C-alpha cells in the first residue's frame, strides 16, 4: 500500500514524501524507512495517525487501521528519548550522491550548523557497530524493500552496484567511504560558516556552496514538474536501400551533408565511384577524414527511388546519415507525431525504426552484452541475483 508521510522536524521545517510498504510491515521497520527519507532518527520520531500516536513498534501497520492512500504525520521529538533504541536504531542516512530528492533535500540543507554537526562527525560514523555503520542490517532492509532499492539505484548508483554485487565487504566499504565523505563536507561547511566574514577564500567557497544548492533546487523542481526531461530518446533511423543493398540510415537535419561510412560504401559496391579530389576533413563534435565523394547514387526509400550524393568518411560508426542537403532536395518532413519521414516530392512516407531494430551503435547503453534486454528486466534480474546471494550468505552463517 502507498502511504503519504507529512514530516515536521524540530526546526519546524516540513517535508512530504510517499512510501510503498506492505500491510503487514511492522512499525519499527516503517520508522527506519522514514529515517532514510527524512533524516530524522527513528528514536526521535513520533508517528501519528488519525490524531492517535502509534507506539507499539512490533505491531503491523494494518493493525493500526492504516490502508492504501492514508496520510500519517511524522514529528521529531523535542528531546531524544533516552530509553534503549528499537530494533533498527540510528540507521545510516544515505547520501544519494548529493542529488536532491523532490520535497526532501532542501529543508535538510537549511538545518542549523550545530544540528548538522551532531549527526555528521566522523566519530559517530565509525563508533557504533549496531548504529550508523551496520551495513548488514541496512543491506537486508534494502533488499527486502524493492521500492527503496529502486530509489537507491536511481540516486546512488555506486552504492546500489555494491549492494547488488552480493559482497557485504564491498558494500560496507562503499557505505563507509560515502559516510566519511559526507562528514568531511559537513565539517568543511561548518568551518566556512564560522570563518572570518572578510576572508575572500571563505566567501568564495560559501558562494560556490550556495550555487550548488540553487542547482539542486532547480533539479528538484525539474524532477517534480518535468521528469521526462531526465529520460533518453533514441535517434531517428529509417530503412532504405543503396544500390540494391539494405542500409539503416540516420536522419539528421542538423548535418550539412549526407555521409556514408567507407565500410558501408564497400558493401554497396560504390567505392569505385568515389572522387578523391573531394577529400578533406569533416568537423562537428569531433573530426573525421573524408575520403572523397560519390556524386550520384540511387537511394530507395519504400517504393521511391531518389538520386543522392554521398561524402565517404574513413572511420564512421553509423553506415549512412541523411543530411540537410538530401532532406531539402526532396522536401522531406520529419513528422514526430506520426513518427514518420515524409518525402515531399513524392508524398510517400516511411516509419522511423524502433530501438530494437536500430544498429548497435545507436541503441541506448544497458551494459555490455545486454543491448537486447529491457531496463526493467535488468533490474529484476539483478534483484533476484542479490536476494539469492543474500540467502546463501545467511545459510553459511548459520551454526
UniProtKB/Swiss-Prot annotation:
Catalytic machinery residues: 252
GO molecular function terms listed in the Swiss-Prot or TrEMBL record: aspartic-type endopeptidase activity; identical protein binding; ubiquitin binding
Domain of life: Eukaryota
EC number: 3.4.23.-
Region Disordered: start-end pairs: 99-134
Keywords from the named record: Aspartyl protease, Chromosome, Cytoplasm, Hydrolase, Phosphoprotein, Protease
Residues where Phosphothreonine is found: 104
Role according to the record: Aspartic protease that mediates the cleavage of NFE2L1/NRF1 at 'Leu-104', thereby promoting release of NFE2L1/NRF1 from the endoplasmic reticulum membrane. Ubiquitination of NFE2L1/NRF1 is a prerequisite for cleavage, suggesting that DDI2 specifically recognizes and binds ubiquitinated NFE2L1/NRF1. Seems to act as a proteasomal shuttle which links the proteasome and replication fork proteins like RTF2. Required, with DDI1, for cellular survival following replication stress.
UniProt subunit comment: Homodimer. Interacts with MCM6; PCNA; PSMD4; PSMD8; RPA2 and RPN2. Interacts with RTF2.
Name assigned to this protein: Protein DDI1 homolog 2
Lineage: Eukaryota, Metazoa, Chordata, Craniata, Vertebrata
Gene this protein is translated from: DDI2
